[in-house]
């Protein structure tokens, strides 16, 4: 199988040679940025229809996460066309962030169709650099089908931790790699170099659950889901939530240096994705 992968990758490359040549010459990326929002505007409603009940179950937990303002301050990371707006509870104060400014046209349409929400602003920036958002300013961050295409999931999750208030929650829905060594994983490896160009940087073989485990959340609830479109190579999905920890006792009593605290390795608490 290890020998077969590069041979099949070469075959796919030859079949899609014009695309790879355009990418090499720097012509493909601007074109992709322009057409990708139109592609998502077609695909995301179809995807939502297939996973609607699960999305409603996941995002129903947002309602009880109000902050000091009495409303939920929600950041949608990689907001795309705004396909998730319909699932958010009324009154959320939504900030949208996406590195692709061409999504704004579709966001405006989604905002008009979902007037139960309060929209703050649209920030054009990558998830690795959210400097325009203040520390601890968000009660909730939503990230759906985003960590597959960012340059550094680790840096994105660090930024998520920074903008979340203590006790704030990251809600995620991501596609991940098939089991290592399976035929499905082999085909993901074969298609990935070409798929990254078609899907605006989307990687098929990321083990995103490991990035979440290493991100120092105090609690993680995660559930595995089958892909909504079995004819695509995107593989299984993971959905769930991750809670930002409150300041450690050591940080809270730093003014008392004489007090010695035992160092305990961080381990997130894993719970089934049920209830609120």
Where are these regions (language model features)?
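A short glycine-rich, Lys/Arg-flanked "PGG" loop and its adjoining helix->strand segment in the class I
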Residues: 154-166
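Core SAM-dependent methyltransferase catalytic element
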Residues: 215, 222-276
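Class I SAM-dependent methyltransferase SAM/SAH-binding core
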Residues: 73-131
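N-terminal auxiliary segments of SAM/dcSAM-dependent transferases
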Residues: 1-29
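C-terminal alpha-helical "lid/dimerization" subdomain adjacent to the S-adenosyl-L-methionine
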Residues: 22-26, 34-52, 173-236, 241
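A short SAM/SAH-binding and catalytic strip from SAM-dependent methyltransferases
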Residues: 139-153
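Conserved alpha-helix/loop element of class I SAM-dependent methyltransferases that forms part
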Residues: 45-73, 83-87
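Short conserved loop adjoining the S-adenosyl-L-methionine
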Residues: 129-135, 151
């Amino acid at each position: 199988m290890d020998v077969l992968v590069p041979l099949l990758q070469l075959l796919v490359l030859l079949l899609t040679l014009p695309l790879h040549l355009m990418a090499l010459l720097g012509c493909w990326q601007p074109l992709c940025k322009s057409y990708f929002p139109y592609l998502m505007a077609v695909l995301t409603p179809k995807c939502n229809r297939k996973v609607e009940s699960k999305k409603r179950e996941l995002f129903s937990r947002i309602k009880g996460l109000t902050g000091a303002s009495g409303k939920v301050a929600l950041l949608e990371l990689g907001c795309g066309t705004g396909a998730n707006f319909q699932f958010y509870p009324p009154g959320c104060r939504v900030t949208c962030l996406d590195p692709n400014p061409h999504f704004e046209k579709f966001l405006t349409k989604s905002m008009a169709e979902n007037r139960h929400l309060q929209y703050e602003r649209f920030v054009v920036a990558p998830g690795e650099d959210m400097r325009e958002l203040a520390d601890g300013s968000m009660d909730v961050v939503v990230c759906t089908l985003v960590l597959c295409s960012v340059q550094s999931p680790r840096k994105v999750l660090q930024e998520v931790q920074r903008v979340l208030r203590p006790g704030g929650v990251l809600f995620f829905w991501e596609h991940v790699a098939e089991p290592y060594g399976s035929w499905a994983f082999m085909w993901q490896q074969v298609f990935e170099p070409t798929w990254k160009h078609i899907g605006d940087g989307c990687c098929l073989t990321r083990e995103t659950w490991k990035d979440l485990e290493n991100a120092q959340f105090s609690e993680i609830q995660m559930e595995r889901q089958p892909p909504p479109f079995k004819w695509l190579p995107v593989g299984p999905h993971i959905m769930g939530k991750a809670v930002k920890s409150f300041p450690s006792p050591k940080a809270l009593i730093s003014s008392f240096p004489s007090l010695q605290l035992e160092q305990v390795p961080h381990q997130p608490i894993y719970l089934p994705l049920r209830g609120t």
